[in-house]
């Protein structure tokens, strides 16, 4: 694995209908949206995940953890953790969970500020939320 500061990152914003994906470099501290993968009750097309991992070859995979505002966990936290464990178990990648409170809210704000569609049911923001998860992790590493 490369030295801290030089790692390739892939971030996932787990959801039951869609899973947002972003990539980035720790050195730059920024990410770019890659994809919004369809999911059926939180179960992705694992072949799509495998293809992304093969293409991007991340050193660390980040999975958003949607904690409550009082730091407690909820059902979605358990599902996101399970998704992270499956990523590690299937593909033997290093997985880190990242506090993602308010990332979807912030991503929706960015879309609306840019004049984008407010129909988030059809036009999700999950890939943008994954960017925010990645950037949050980078800021935490930088101290």
Curated annotation (Swiss-Prot):
Q: What is its EC number?
A: 3.1.-.-
**Main location per the UniProt record:** cytoplasm
UniProt GO molecular function: nuclease activity
Offer one Pfam family short name for this entry: RuvX
In the UniProt record, does the keyword Repeat occur? no
What is the annotated localization of this protein?
Cytoplasm
List the SUPFAM superfamilies: Ribonuclease H-like
Which GO BP terms apply? rRNA 5'-end processing
Listed GO cellular component terms? cytosol
Q: Which domain of life is it from?
A: Bacteria
Q: Which keywords, in A-to-Z order, does the entry hold?
A: Cytoplasm, Hydrolase, Nuclease, Ribosome biogenesis
Similarity comment: family membership: Belongs to the YqgF nuclease family.
As for what it does, the entry says: Could be a nuclease involved in processing of the 5'-end of pre-16S rRNA.
Query: What's the protein called, per UniProt?
Result: Putative pre-16S rRNA nuclease
